[in-house]
């Protein structure tokens, strides 16, 4: 999710 992206976690999203 875009929310967890702020935490720098991976949620089926390309989040570093």
From Swiss-Prot:
For this UniProt record, give its keywords in alphabetical order, as a comma-separated list: Amino-acid transport, Antiport, Cell inner membrane, Cell membrane, Membrane, Transmembrane, Transport
Q: Which reaction does it catalyse?
A: L-ornithine(in) + L-arginine(out) = L-ornithine(out) + L-arginine(in)
Q: Does the keyword Metal-binding apply?
A: no
Q: What does this protein do?
A: Catalyzes electroneutral exchange between arginine and ornithine to allow high-efficiency energy conversion in the arginine deiminase pathway.
Q: Please report the record's description of how this protein sits within the membrane.
A: Multi-pass membrane protein
- Report the family membership: Belongs to the amino acid-polyamine-organocation (APC) superfamily. Basic amino acid/polyamine antiporter (APA) (TC 2.A.3.2) family.
Protein name according to UniProt: Arginine/ornithine antiporter
Q: Name one GO molecular function term.
A: antiporter activity
- Gene expressing this chain: arcD
Instruction: Cite the source lineage.
Output: Bacteria, Pseudomonadati, Pseudomonadota, Gammaproteobacteria, Pseudomonadales
> Where, subcellularly, is it found?
Cell inner membrane
Cellular component, GO, one term: plasma membrane
GO biological process, alphabetically ordered? amino acid transport
